[in-house]
């Protein structure tokens, strides 16, 4: 009676020990460093805080009053840089 291809494939794999197949393989990817995530979140929160403070108390804070419409650019730039950093997060 002819042997099936399935059985012959199992015989090839059975020659290696089962312990070799169970050992975990360490990946080379180390992930994102902690400082990167902290910086990313800090930039997003700082941008949000800048916009909220500008909206609530902007005219009462001297340097924010002098910046005028640039406050929106600063706040949104901080938010966008933080959001762009999320693309590098692993």
Swiss-Prot record:
It comes from the Bacteria. Residues 7-18 have a biased composition (Low complexity). It is found in: Cell membrane. Its main location: membrane. It is a multi-pass membrane protein. Keywords: Cell cycle, Cell division, Cell membrane, Membrane, Transmembrane, Transmembrane helix. The chain crosses the membrane at residues 37-57, 69-89. Pfam families: CrgA. GO terms for cellular component: plasma membrane. InterPro entries: CrgA. GO terms for biological process: cell division. Residues 1-27 are annotated as: Disordered. Belongs to the CrgA family. Involved in cell division. This is Cell division protein CrgA. It comes from Corynebacterium jeikeium (strain K411).
């Amino acid at each position: 009676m002819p042997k099936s291809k399935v059985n012959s494939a199992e015989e090839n794999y059975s020659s290696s020990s089962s312990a070799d197949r169970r050992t975990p393989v360490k990946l080379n990817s180390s992930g994102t460093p902690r400082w990167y995530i902290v910086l990313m979140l800090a930039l997003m929160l700082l941008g949000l805080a800048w916009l909220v403070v500008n909206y609530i108390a902007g005219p009462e804070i001297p340097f924010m009053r002098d910046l005028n419409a640039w406050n929106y650019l600063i706040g949104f730039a901080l938010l966008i840089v933080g959001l762009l950093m999320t693309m590098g997060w692993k």
